[in-house]
Amino acid sequence: VDDRSTVQVGVGASITAGNNLVIEALVAVNVDSDANVINGGLVASPNTDATTTLNVTANANLMSNINMRGENITIRAENTKIDAKATANSTVGAAVPIARSESKVTSNTFALVTLDAMEADDAITAQGTLTIIAKQADLSTISTADAEVYGFAGTKSAIANNTQNSTTKITADAQTRLATRSLLVEANSDYLPIINTSASTPGFVLISDDTQDENLTLDQNREIDFFAKVTLLGARSPEIVINEHGLVEKLVNATL
């Protein structure tokens, strides 16, 4: 499975929102491969292979020399849920049974936010809060291989492989210009990802050669390369409206 969600604000773009502005790339993937063989006879040798491969990217790219204005601005790239499974099962009953099962999951996921350079009079301006997030909150990969054999003399082999790679990254150029009263920059991935392998060889064989092999690799990369120029805006201007009777009708950012 190759799945890519990209939102791109082009070079020189100008966007103004009266209230909130959200720019986001979101991806969710659920994939399952299942191989199952049941066999029998005098001499029987079922083989099963189940392979699941994921390449998933959520990418928010703000290109050079853009102007964006809003009350609150959110820029987000997120893989909201990654769920990948591979299940291989071989079952055989024979005088001379030979069963082999191999399952393999390979998951490569990316959540990327990139902010390019801007001219001196360009900026991303949020009057309230500017939020920049790259996130992968729910990562799950499961690989299961079973070779079940019944007979007199035989061989059982179960191999389960599971590789989970995730990269969660925010990059802001040294000439990226931001202005806001509150700034949140977060690159976050699942701190307790599910990554399981299971290889089993159940059954009964009087003379048996069994192989059970489980291989697991987890690589998580969270990174923020943030060199942007940030201007923190001052307190909002007070707004007071008093009617002809001397009564306060509106009071914003001020106390009496």
Identify the meaning behind each predicted range.
Residues V1-L256:
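Low-complexity, glycine- and small/polar-enriched segments
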